[in-house]
Design a protein with these regions (language model features):
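A contiguous loop/helix-start segment that scaffolds small-molecule binding in enzyme catalytic cores
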Residues: 154, 158-266
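Loop/turn-to-beta-strand initiation segments
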Residues: 3-4, 73-77, 153-154
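Short glycine-cluster motifs
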Residues: 72-135
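A short, charged helix-loop
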Residues: 129-150, 216
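Short active-site oxyanion
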Residues: 25-31, 102-106, 154-155
Length: 266
């Protein structure tokens, strides 16, 4: 049965593509590409002559029916401008339409700027939130950041070079001076990964160029208070002044946030 293949392609270096992906592109009846120029560059590099059609944000409605019709006759390979289709691009809508028609959907995994940036960021990767491209307008951007400000997981976002400084200013305002890894031109000749704080990044990227993936530290858990020598001394002083053990513990709990159990054990 004809199948829709969701094919990951390189995010920069053309060598970052699997043999399975190349075979799928070669054998498909049609390739639906978000950016035909970039995809043709990849196909030419590997001598692939499969017919290609454009499928991007501004023609997705008019092209959807055509691509579904082609799927009645043979396999279609969906590719994005770079990386894995369906992430911040119209590929998602084609997948939904294929699913509604019970067309088999198979992923051909591979490059992803999100995972690549996380892997080299030096920030926690056990839990993360991807928020796509940051909104263009400052007000919307701040509201978007505020909605995830309390999340403890790492945050990943895309940003254009001409808006990077504005985005960093809003990051600092809404999230504070958190640790960040700002990845530029990943896998390309001039790849660069900046690791530091938001304020340091503001100073570093005076004239930003290229494509940026931002990896932002999640909200840090407040450090739990500990039973220190001073606290033990405070307990003894309270008891010496006539307070019962229960009263002394209650007062210290109120002042320090320590648990009663910890204080009774001390």
């Amino acid at each position: 049965m004809p199948t829709l293949y969701v094919v990951a392609t390189p995010i920069g270096n053309l060598e970052d593509i699997s043999q399975r992906a190349l075979r799928t592109l070669r054998e498909a009846k049609l390739i639906a590409a978000e950016d035909t120029r970039k995809t043709k560059r990849l196909l030419n590099a590997y001598n692939i002559t499969t017919h290609i059609t454009s499928y991007y944000e501004h023609n997705k409605k008019s092209k959807l029916g055509y691509i579904l019709k082609q799927l009645e006759e043979g396999d279609v390979a969906l590719v994005s401008e770079a990386g894995t289709p369906g992430i911040s691009d119209p590929g998602y809508e084609l997948v939904v339409a294929a699913r509604e028609k019970d067309i088999p959907i198979v992923a051909i995994p591979g490059p992803s700027a999100i995972v690549t940036a996380l892997a080299v960021s030096g920030l926690p990767t056990d839990r993360f939130t991807y928020i796509g491209f940051l909104p263009r307008k400052s007000g919307e951007r701040r509201r978007s950041l505020q909605s995830i400000a309390d999340g403890v997981g790492t945050i990943v976002a895309f940003e254009a070079p001409h808006r990077l400084q504005e985005a960093l200013a809003d990051l600092l305002l809404v999230l504070g001076d958190r640790r960040v890894a700002i990845c530029r031109q990943l896998t390309k000749l001039h790849e660069e990964v900046f690791r530091g704080t938001v304020s340091q990044a503001q100073q570093y990227f005076k004239e930003p160029r290229g494509e940026f993936t931002l990896v932002i530290e999640g909200k840090r858990d407040k450090e739990k208070p500990k039973v220190t020598g001073d606290i033990l001394k405070q307990l003894k002083t309270l008891k010496a002044s006539g307070a019962t053990a229960r009263e002394a513990v209650a007062k210290v709990v109120l002042e320090t946030g320590l648990s009663r159990k910890e204080l009774y054990r001390a």
